[in-house]
Every structure is written in structure tokens, then in C-alpha cells.
């Protein structure tokens, strides 16, 4: 599998990637010949050659279909897995190449810092007049918080991810130019071993993962990857500051992490008070175990003897205090360590950590106490010639404690507004609660939200579940500390009453502090086009409400609002979603500023462009002026977690990019663009007409039947990808009730990617017909928001394939003739205007590296897609009862997901 079309040209820096892909492709061929047969490999080559020829001629996939249709399920599954294995090694090669390129930049010196890194950000800031003093004033305000979620978009098993890490490690080791031939042979053997083990491991689990499984999955990235790179991130920033300004700064904590795993109740009956408590306990154990292990390793390093070197009086005093506090632990210290005060203190610190883990006497009351002990050691080492005798290792642990505390990651809780509304309606005995005016409901809720009256207790399941949740949060605050808890997010928030409802329920559940306030940050999530449009009014009403304003004063007069990228796109199309999000941020910031409240945004981004994915650096550059202000809180979902944080070097790069982008956007936001006043009405028109086209398509009669026939949504619903159902429980199959993730996933699998572009062409055409073509060209050239929007659409279009999409569409029978021509026409219109406004002859002309990456994969995705159509038709003929066909279809879904590198 190592032939390539001559039209694939690699730039000079990427030639090593080409060599890796060829070498690993040949290795995949060897694997297939060994594990299946030489005849099987020859058949794969015939299919691959046909797919490449089809791509080069841009013809319908009839030849591929004749080669692939009618195969036995097991034979079809083997074919899919063969092509999927190729994607696997290409993805690995590209990730390792990113590490290679990073090292190339580092070797070249700081005269050419890697773009979007910390060195690059600081150089740009200095060039724009930022002084060291200004940087020092801003750093304490920087707060970057990736929040990991367990949405069912990760289509790769944990067992396979671990083997992939082994393959990555062998390739990274091979980057060392000093490796001997024997060592290189060993590296190749390690890669082959992990690759073969992957081939012999089923692609998907036979059972749906539990919340505990998802918690373990996310915990792997937190404890095994990010735990290790956090100190390196701070060391990199220190070095960048010194290189740029010639001086150093004492760095505050800039990064922390959040999670939804175990706390996201929205539509998931498996998440409740028990998973909240269990998650917090599990995370506490995980991070304290890491600290204990690291202290154990430090014990042998910190063996300084008082006969040779002194220690600080403060450290000696702390040692004496701990010996009195923990006499049993002190007695267990070995006599031969009696002249090693650092080691003796280390023994007692481990005893305190163990007591913290066991909830026993002598426990640390808070992470700050452990930080204090570590700082004592650092100060003593620095004062006594120990900078090169353990100081570096101790400081790395200190950075970890500052970043992860005793909780590892802050746990958010999320629930849909209607669940709260039903509970309050039952508690107040008002069956018509939903039909009452929102202002009237808010007035009724005021006394309960303020604590003047107690919300009645009701003996029903809904109220009992919510009471248990708030009781669990109150207990968690006492047991784990306030830092362990993130926000309480209200999905599908529509008005002020939705927020006051949560405040009233929290009081009833016992989540009240000693001052009588509810110690909870309540975050409305605006996720439909209408809610984004009305969000400013909702926040104005909320901040003007005396009860809520009193609550907010106790929270530091800071309000967070979450912006939903997924459902707004499903609701009104991508143009209306993007523009609605942009306008909402501007209007919300203005409203909050007028009322004296600091507003921060929580971006609910998904993995794909359709759901707000893409490069953080470009997203922040395109964000409204003043919307960052030192803070970035963003969800990291599904396959994004593995892509960004699966390898230590790439995790470090991701953290650097986010931190650098926040620094740039905060200290030197983009200069105001006076033409934006003229551009906004143009964008209003684009969004409005795009929405009309999009809703006209997805709202057409029989559309949902077409969707269910022309995509593999029925297969996706049967897959065991996550603990949450694909639609909200107890609701029908209408589009409004389908989750955004399977909606996008299904269209991506069908290669049409409708949510990522449909309606954009109509919107742009309408603006041109209204006489705005020159403005659109200016916007594409000079407005980062619009340029990023068009670039993202171009990327989505590049990953689609109209010929393959037509094969899927024909599965819908008579509905094909009604819907597919509309897809074809809108696609042509969208491609035309995107290329025209970007001034490009072909999509992604400005990003040849991304274009090459997509072209590398497409000929290998096509056979899987064609096979998927054939299998889907046969499986549906059995009414979905043939398990062998289903297993082959699941393999197809996994293969396409690996190929396009997007699920939902």
C-alpha cells in the first residue's frame, strides 16, 4: 500500500512525512499478507487502484461498487479494517511529523519561533508595545480551562488508543538521529507488535460504556498525559519570557481543567447524585496517588545530609511540628535517614497525603498546605546550594499541585431547563406552569430563590433526583472544597425564570453556605438560534433581578454564559449559528458592562467544524473584541481529546497555543474595524437567507424519513459509543429532539456533511443580488470572523463527496429525487461563492498541507463508503436483525471516522 499519485507533492519540510507514510503503508501491506493472505493484499491493491483512478477522473463510483457489492459480512469487515489500518498509520505519522516539525523549530533557535507557540506570542506582544510590567499585571488574570466531555463521538476504543501510543513512542524514539541500526530495528519491531495487536483487537466494544468507563477514559488523559506536561508548559513560558524580555517573572497559575464526565445529566439517566459523588472521589484518589508516587521518587533524590549542607530554619521547624503531629509516622522513619531532613519531611508529607486519601487524622486540610510544604523545600534548597540538587524536580510537583489541587479537574453539572421546570411545577402544584408568562414565573420564584420561603418538598422521582444532586454538591463542597466544583449549566435556557428555578431548587437541596448564600455559579446555556438572539434580553432581565443580583454579588459580580455551537447549527444552519454566536457575544458584553458585571463566556465547541471545532488560535482571533479578556473556557469533546491530548508533545503544543492565543487576544486585541458597522447588515442578510434555505430543506415534508434512509443514523444509534442516548428520552424522532452529535455524525458518514454548509450558498447569493458583492470581498479579505467562516466552510466541502453522497441518497427510494437535486444545487452554489470570495481556483488552495492530508485519505475512504452503502441496504432488508452485517457496518463507521478525522 505504498504507491502514490504523482500529483501528490510534498513540500520540502514534509518530505520526512512522505517517507514515513510510504514506509508505514508498506508495513500495513506486510501485516495484511501475514494476518490474512497474499491474495487478500492483492485484492486490496486492486480496490485501492480503482479508487485512485476514480478520484483522478472525478467520476461516479460505479466501478468501485461492482468490485465491492455482495460480499459476505466477514469479508467486508476485513476489507474495511484493512483500509482503516492505513488511516491509523497515516494519522500516527502526521502526529509524529508535528513533533518533528516542533523539534526542527526548537533546533533552529528563537530567531524563528514556531508560529502560534508561546515564543511567537510574546514576540508579537513585545513588537506591539507590551512591556514586562504590563505582562506581569496581566498574567494573574489569565485563566485557561479546557473542559473534557464524554459525548459519544469517540469512535476508537481505549485498548486501541493505548496501542496507538506505543506506536507513536516507537516513531518518536526513531527521530533520534543517534539511534544505532539495532535500535532502529527494535523501534520497527515495537511498532509492528502494536500494529498487529491492534489488528487482532475488535474496533468497538460489544457493550455500551458506563459513566465509570468514560470517567476512566478521560482520567487517562488527565493523569497520564496532562499531569506530565503541565510543568513543561510553565517552564516553556518562563524561557519564552526570559528570551523575549531578558528577565524572568514569577508565574501564577494560568491553567486548570474541567470535566462533565459524571455530572452531565442532560438526557442521560445514568448520571445522578451517585455519579457526581463517585466521580469526585475517583478523581481525588487518582491525583493523590500521583502525588504520593512522585513524593516517593523525590525521597531518594532529596538525600542531603546536615553534615554536608544546611537547611532553612523554617523547614526544620516544619519538620519538628510534623513529628509532633504524626508521631506514629515519624517513628517509622528509618534511623539511617536521621541526618536527612528533606527525606524525613518527605516521609511525613506522604503520611499526611495518605491520611488525606483515607480521610484520617493528620490529613491536609487543603492543597495550599501541600503547596506550602513544597515551597519550604524549594526555598531551603535555593538558599543552600540546592538549585541543581532537586529544586527542579520539586518545583515540577509544585506546578502540578497548583494546577490539579486535590480534585484533578473541576466537575460541572448540567441539566435541561424543562427538568427543573417540571420539578418546580410539581412542588408548587401548578400544572399549567409551562404556559404561564416567563416574567410571572420569575416573580413567583423570587421568594424561593432568595430563601424568604422554602420551596415545598414533593415526594416524586424528579424532585427526589434533583434534591439528591444538590445535596451531593453541598457534601462535595465540604469534603472536596469549592475548587472541586465547576458550574451548574442549564441547557436549553430560555429566560430568567430558568435560572431562578435552579437557585430555588439548590436552596431546597441544602446547598447554602454559612452566610445564607447559594455557593454555586449558575450558567445559562443558549443553544438555539432564537435563544442566542434573545440571550441579551435574558441576561439583562437576570442582572436586573434583585434576588439574582444579590446572589451574583456573593459570587464576585461575575456571570458566565455558555454558548452552544452544536444545537444552534442544527436549528438554523451554520451561517446563522456562527453569526448568532458572534452577535450574541457583542451584545451580551455591552449589556453586562452597563450593569457593572464582568461577563465571561464558556464555549461549547464540538469536534467538527459544524459544531464549532477548528483551531483555537483562529477562533480567538475571529472573536469579538474584548470577549476573551484573559479567560478561555471551552469544551473538548470526543475525538478532539485524543487528537489534541493523546500524545504528550502535542498536548503541550495545544496548551501553548491556547495560552498564547489568550495572551494575544487579551493584551492586544484586534484594533476596531470601522467598516464592521457596514458589514453587519450584510452578514445579517447572509444569515437570514441561509436560514431560510436550510430550514426549507430540513423542514420539508418527509425530510426526517429521507434523513433516516439516506444516512446510517440507524447504525449509529445501535453503536456502543457512549453512555448517553442519541436523543432525549421519551421524545419522538423529530429533528428538534435528535442530538446534534448523531445528526452531524450521520451526515459526515454519508459524505454529504449537510450541517456544515447547506444554506451558505443561498445566503451569499442573496447578498450578491442585493448589491453587496464588493462588501463580501472586503469582508473575506479584512474581517477575521468572515474569513475564518469561509475557510471553515471550504474545509468541510473538501471532506465531502457528492458522488458518494448520491449513493447514500438513492437508499431513500422515491425521496431521492425530491431531496438530492436540492443538495446538488446548493452545494454547487456554495462552492462557487466560497472559492470566488476567497479568490481561489480550488478549495483549500491557501492551505496546501491540509489539502494534501485530505487527498491522502480520500481514495481510501471511498471504498469503505461504497461498501457501507451496499451493507446498509442489505442490513435494512433484514429489518436490522442481521448481527454480522451490523458488525461490518460498525467497522465502516469507525473506518470513515478515522479517515475524515471527525465523528460528530
From Swiss-Prot:
The keyword Magnesium applies. Gene3D superfamilies: Phosphoenolpyruvate/pyruvate domain (1.20.1440.90). It is an enzyme of class 4 (lyase). One of its GO terms (molecular function) is phosphoenolpyruvate carboxylase activity. It catalyses: oxaloacetate + phosphate = phosphoenolpyruvate + hydrogencarbonate. One of its GO terms (biological process) is carbon fixation. InterPro entries: PEP_COase, PEP_COase_bac/pln-type, PEP_COase_Lys_AS, PEPCASE_His_AS, Pyrv/PenolPyrv_kinase-like_dom. Its cofactor is Mg(2+). Keywords: Carbon dioxide fixation, Lyase, Magnesium. Its EC number is 4.1.1.31. GO terms for cellular component: cytosol. The active site is at 151, 570. SUPFAM superfamilies: Phosphoenolpyruvate/pyruvate domain. It comes from the Bacteria. Forms oxaloacetate, a four-carbon dicarboxylic acid source for the tricarboxylic acid cycle. Belongs to the PEPCase type 1 family. This is Phosphoenolpyruvate carboxylase. It comes from Xanthomonas campestris pv. campestris (strain 8004). The gene is ppc.
Amino acid at each position: 500500500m505504498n504507491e502514490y499519485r504523482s500529483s501528490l507533492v510534498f513540500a520540502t519540510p514534509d518530505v520526512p512525512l512522505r517517507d514515513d507514510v510510504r514506509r508505514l503503508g508498506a508495513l500495513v501491506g506486510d501485516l495484511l499478507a501475514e494476518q490474512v493472505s497474499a491474495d487478500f493484499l492483492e485484492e486490496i491493491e486492486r480496490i485501492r487502484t480503482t479508487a485512485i483512478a476514480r478520484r483522478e477522473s472525478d467520476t461516479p463510483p460505479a466501478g468501485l461498487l461492482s468490485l465491492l457489492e455482495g460480499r459476505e459480512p466477514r469479508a467486508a469487515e476485513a476489507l474495511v479494517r484493512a483500509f482503516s489500518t492505513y488511516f491509523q498509520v497515516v494519522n500516527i505519522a502526521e502526529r509524529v511529523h508535528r513533533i518533528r516539525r516542533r523539534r526542527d523549530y526548537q533546533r533552529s533557535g528563537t530567531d524563528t519561533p514556531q508560529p502560534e507557540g508561546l515564543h511567537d506570542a510574546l514576540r508579537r506582544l513585545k513588537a506591539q508595545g507590551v512591556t514586562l510590567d504590563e505582562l506581569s499585571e496581566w498574567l494573574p488574570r489569565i485563566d485557561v480551562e479546557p473542559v473534557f466531555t464524554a459525548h459519544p463521538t469517540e469512535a476508537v476504543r481505549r485498548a486501541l488508543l493505548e496501542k496507538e501510543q506505543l506506536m507513536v513512542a516507537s516513531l518518536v524514539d526513531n527521530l533520534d538521529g543517534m539511534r544505532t541500526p539495532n535500535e532502529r530495528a527494535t523501534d520497527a519491531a515495537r511498532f509492528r507488535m502494536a500494529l498487529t495487536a491492534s489488528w487482532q483487537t475488535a474496533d468497538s466494544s460489544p457493550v455500551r460504556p458506563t459513566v465509570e468507563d468514560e470517567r476512566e477514559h478521560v482520567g487517562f488523559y488527565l493523569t497520564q498525559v496532562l499531569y506530565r506536561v503541565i510543568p513543561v508548559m510553565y517552564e516553556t513560558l518562563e524561557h519564552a519570557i526570559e528570551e523575549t524580555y531578558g528577565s524572568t517573572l514569577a508565574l501564577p497559575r494560568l491553567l486548570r481543567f474541567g470535566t462533565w464526565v459524571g455530572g452531565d445529566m442532560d438526557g442521560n439517566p445514568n448520571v445522578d447524585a451517585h455519579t457526581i459523588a463517585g466521580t469526585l472521589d475517583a478523581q481525588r484518589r487518582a491525583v493523590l496517588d500521583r502525588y504520593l508516587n512522585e513524593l516517593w521518587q523525590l525521597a531518594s533524590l532529596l538525600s542531603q545530609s546536615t553534615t554536608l549542607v544546611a537547611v532553612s530554619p523554617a523547614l526544620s521547624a516544619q519538620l519538628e511540628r510534623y513529628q509532633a503531629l504524626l508521631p506514629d509516622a515519624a517513628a517509622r522513619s528509618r534511623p539511617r535517614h536521621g541526618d536527612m531532613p528533606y527525606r524525613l519531611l518527605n516521609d511525613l508529607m506522604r503520611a499526611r497525603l495518605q491520611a488525606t486519601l483515607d480521610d484520617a487524622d493528620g490529613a491536609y486540610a487543603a492543597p495550599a498546605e501541600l503547596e506550602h510544604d513544597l515551597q519550604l523545600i524549594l526555598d531551603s534548597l535555593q538558599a543552600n546550594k540546592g538549585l541543581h540538587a532537586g529544586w527542579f524536580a520539586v518545583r515540577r510537583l509544585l506546578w502540578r499541585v497548583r494546577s490539579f489541587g486535590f480534585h484533578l479537574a473541576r466537575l460541572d453539572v448540567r441539566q435541561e431547563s424543562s427538568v427543573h421546570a417540571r420539578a418546580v411545577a410539581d412542588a408548587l402544584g401548578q400544572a399549567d406552569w409551562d404556559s404561564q408568562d416567563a416574567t410571572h414565573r420569575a416573580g413567583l420564584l423570587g421568594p424561593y430563590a432568595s430563601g424568604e420561603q422554602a420551596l415545598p418538598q414533593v415526594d416524586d422521582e424528579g424532585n427526589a433526583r434533583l434534591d439528591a444532586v444538590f445535596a451531593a454538591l453541598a457534601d462535595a463542597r465540604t469534603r472536596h472544597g469549592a475548587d472541586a466544583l465547576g458550574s451548574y449549566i442549564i441547557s436549553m435556557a430560555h429566560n430568567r425564570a430558568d435560572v431562578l428555578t435552579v437557585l430555588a431548587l439548590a436552596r431546597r437541596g441544602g446547598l447554602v453556605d454559612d452566610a445564607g448564600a447559594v455557593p454555586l455559579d449558575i450558567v445559562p446555556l443558549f443553544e438555539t438560534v432564537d435563544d442566542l438572539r434573545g440571550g441579551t434580553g435574558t441576561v439583562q432581565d437576570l442582572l436586573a433581578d434583585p434576588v439574582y443580583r444579590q446572589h451574583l454579588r456573593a459570587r464576585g459580580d461575575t456571570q458566565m454564559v455558555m454558548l452552544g455551537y452544536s444545537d444552534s447549527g442544527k436549528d438554523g444552519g451554520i451561517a446563522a449559528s456562527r453569526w448568532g454566536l458572534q452577535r450574541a457575544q457583542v451584545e451580551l458584553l455591552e449589556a453586562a458592562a452597563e450593569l457593572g458585571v464582568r461577563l465571561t463566556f464558556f464555549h461549547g465547541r464540538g469536534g467538527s467544524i459544524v459544531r464549532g471545532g477548528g483551531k483555537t488560535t483562529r477562533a480567538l482571533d475571529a472573536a469579538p473584541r474584548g470577549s476573551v479578556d484573559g479567560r478561555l473556557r471551552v469544551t473538548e469533546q470526543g475525538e478532539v481529546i485524543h487528537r489534541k491530548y493523546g500524545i504528550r508533545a502535542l498536548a503541550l503544543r495545544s496548551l501553548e497555543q491556547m495560552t498564547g492565543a489568550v495572551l494575544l487576544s487579551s493584551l492586544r486585541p484586534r484594533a476596531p474595524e470601522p467598516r464592521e458597522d457596514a458589514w453587519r447588515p450584510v452578514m445579517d442578510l447572509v444569515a437570514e437567507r441561509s436560514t431560510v434555505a436550510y430550514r426549507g430543506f430540513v423542514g420539508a415534508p418527509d425530510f426526517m424519513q429521507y434523513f433516516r434512509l439516506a444516512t446510517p443514523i440507524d447504525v449509529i444509534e445501535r453503536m456502543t459509543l457512549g453512555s448517553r442516548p442519541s436523543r432525549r428520552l421519551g421524545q419522538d424522532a423529530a429533528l428538534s429532539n435528535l442530538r446534534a452529535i448523531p445528526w452531524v455524525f450521520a451526515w459526515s458518514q454519508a459524505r454529504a456533511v449537510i450541517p456544515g454548509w447547506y444554506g451558505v450558498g443561498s445566503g451569499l447569493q442573496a447578498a450578491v443580488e442585493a448589491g453587496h458583492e464588493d462588501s463580501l470581498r472586503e469582508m473575506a479579505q479584512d474581517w477575521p470572523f468572515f474569513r475564518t467562516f469561509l475557510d471553515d466552510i471550504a474545509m468541510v466541502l473538501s471532506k465531502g463527496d457528492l458522488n458518494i453522497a448520491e449513493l447514500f441518497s438513492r437508499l431513500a427510494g422515491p425521496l431521492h429525487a425530491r431531496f438530492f437535486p436540492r443538495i446538488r444545487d446548493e452545494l454547487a452554489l456554495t462552492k462557487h461563492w466560497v472559492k470566488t470570495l476567497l479568490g481561489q481556483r480550488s478549495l483549500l488552495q491557501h492551505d496546501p498541507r491540509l489539502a494534501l492530508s485530505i487527498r491522502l485519505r480520500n481514495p481510501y475512504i471511498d471504498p469503505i463508503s461504497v461498501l457501507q452503502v451496499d451493507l446498509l441496504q442489505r442490513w435494512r432488508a433484514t429489518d436490522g436483525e442481521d448481527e454480522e452485517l451490523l458488525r461490518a457496518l460498525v467497522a465502516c463507521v469507525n473506518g470513515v471516522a478515522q479517515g475524515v478525522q471527525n465523528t460528530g
